[in-house]
């Protein structure tokens, strides 16, 4: 797979990943981490210099948490958003105890999504991502807008969830120290 954007070229060789594996991507800005995640998510990207399609997406189900928070206005409560987007996960005791409680989603349930802070929205977005049934979880910058304690908690939640569910994840962080804990 090759992605070309001006002078920037991202080449990916064939690789493998297994269940219960988290691949953490670290690197300087502009090195292709988000582009790689978007490729796996199936986002439309560029055409290479020869005019051919730049990537082929393997067939698997994906749950994707974008690095940027949506500017879309959700005129609903967090409870309604969760019940609409991940009703099955929210009904599972293990998901509630392993994801919702550590991320403190319960205390946000009756708040309007639009009125949440950036960190609160980030925690909800992470819960929504993990609440979707998928083979691979693509988690782009899950620690953005979170304070240091919340970053550690979010990293532990991701790790525990992926290991227990025997899934694979690609996670992009600016700080590898946080995920290593």
From Swiss-Prot:
Quote one Gene Ontology molecular function term: ATP hydrolysis activity
- In which tissues is this gene expressed? Mostly expressed in roots and leaves, and, to a lower extent, in stems, flowers and siliques.
Q: What PROSITE patterns does this protein's entry cite?
A: ABC_TRANSPORTER_1 (PS00211)
A Pfam family in this protein?
ABC_tran
Domain ABC transporter: where?
20-176
Q: Does the keyword Cytoplasm apply?
A: no
Q: Where are the transmembrane segments?
A: none
User: Where ATP is bound, by residue?
Assistant: 27-34
| InterPro entries listed in its UniProt record | AAA+_ATPase, ABC_transporter-like_ATP-bd, P-loop_NTPase, RLI1
Q: Which UniProt keywords apply?
A: ATP-binding, Nucleotide-binding, Transport
Q: Where is the signal peptide?
A: none
Q: Say which family it is in.
A: Belongs to the ABC transporter superfamily. ABCE family.
- Its name, as the record gives it, is ABC transporter E family member 3
């Amino acid at each position: 797979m090759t992605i070309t954007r001006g002078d920037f070229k991202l080449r990916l060789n064939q690789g493998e990943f297994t269940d219960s594996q988290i691949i953490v991507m670290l690197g300087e800005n502009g090195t292709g981490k988000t582009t790689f995640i978007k490729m796996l998510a199936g986002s439309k990207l560029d055409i290479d210099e020869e005019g051919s399609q730049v990537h082929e997406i393997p067939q698997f189900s994906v749950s994707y948490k974008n690095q940027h928070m949506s500017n879309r206005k959700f005129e609903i409560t967090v409870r309604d958003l969760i019940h609409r987007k991940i009703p099955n996960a929210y009904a599972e005791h293990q998901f509630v105890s392993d994801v919702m409680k550590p991320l403190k989603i319960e205390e946000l349930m009756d708040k309007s999504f639009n009125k949440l802070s950036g960190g609160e929205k980030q925690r909800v977005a992470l819960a929504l991502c993990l609440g979707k049934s998928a083979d691979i979880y693509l988690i782009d910058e899950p620690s953005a807008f979170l304070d240091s304690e919340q970053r550690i908690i979010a990293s532990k939640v991701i790790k525990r969830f992926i290991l227990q569910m025997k899934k694979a994840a690609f996670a992009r962080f600016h700080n590898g120290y946080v995920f290593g804990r």
